[in-house]
Design a protein with these regions (language model features):
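Charged helix-capping and loop-helix junction motifs
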Residues: 81-88, 160-167, 222
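Glycine/Thr-rich beta-alpha phosphate-binding loop at enzyme active sites
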Residues: 38, 135-173, 211-217
């Protein structure tokens, strides 16, 4: 966002700042779980024709320097292009794991098998208000890390930290996988609070896209604006993340 060249520069900045992992999304229409900021980012990327092959080329360029998780939507990317084909191509490009967006847990077993065949770990997504059965399904299908959604609603909302530690502790008792906290982390302070709550990974998405959007609107440099913001996030992560 807004184009592949900007994304390339931002990936290079992530490498320079020591970011451990990046979630790279294949843009898609009707991103109903995303707030306005990420919906605008999807739209800008689609206008630049950010195809699967173009995104995977970026992955191939950077996969030896930083772990890249590929976020692919079930309805708009995986099923239309073919789950097995997408996963095999992603693995060949060097993707470190895959996050299937919009995939119901009841369909997760077949996806997990396809990912296993491709040699790709799967990121499981779980909401705080998930039913016990849904939790059981997601935990059983997760092989990379578990993405705990901090707030129910659309991405970019405020974090409610009051019971996050309890939720993370409860999940940790049932999975050996690292636990990531995301959906609503907007500042270095939020990143610090995520680690204070016991998460292993803090995910910031909308706020980074917001830096790009703000720079585009004001005639600034999105690479510098988003890059400096990433540096501030990474500094907080480095200072607060458990050793």
């Amino acid at each position: 966002d807004p184009n592949l060249d900007t994304t390339r520069h931002l990936l290079a900045r992530c490498v320079a700042e020591g970011v451990a992992m990046v979630e790279l999304c294949l843009p898609f229409r009707n991103a109903f779980t995303d707030g306005a900021t990420l919906q605008h980012a999807h739209a800008r990327a689609l206008q630049q024709e950010a195809s699967l092959q173009a995104v995977l080329q970026l992955v191939a360029e950077f996969s030896s320097r930083i772990k890249i998780i590929l976020l692919a939507d079930s309805s708009h990317t995986l099923r239309p292009l073919g789950i097995e084909q997408v996963l095999q191509q992603a693995a060949a490009a060097g993707v470190a794991g895959v996050l299937p967006h919009g995939l119901p847990p009841r369909l997760g077993e077949s996806f997990q098998e396809a990912a296993r065949q491709a040699g790709l770990p799967v990121v499981g997504t779980i909401y705080a208000n998930a039913t016990p059965e849904t939790r059981r399904q997601v935990l059983g299908q997760t092989t990379a890390f578990l993405y705990l959604v901090s707030t129910y609603g659309r991405s970019g909302g405020a974090v409610e930290p009051s019971d996050l530690k309890c939720q993370i502790d409860a999940l940790r008792a049932h999975t050996p996988c690292p636990i990531a906290l995301g959906f609503g982390l907007r500042s270095p302070g939020d990143v610090g609070r995520a680690f204070d709550a016991g998460s292993d990974i803090a995910i910031v998405g909308s706020a980074v896209a917001g830096q790009v959007e703000a720079a585009l609107k004001t005639g600034g440099c999105p690479i510098a604006s988003a890059g400096d913001f990433i540096a501030a996030l990474q500094k907080e992560a480095h200072d607060r993340r458990p050793a």
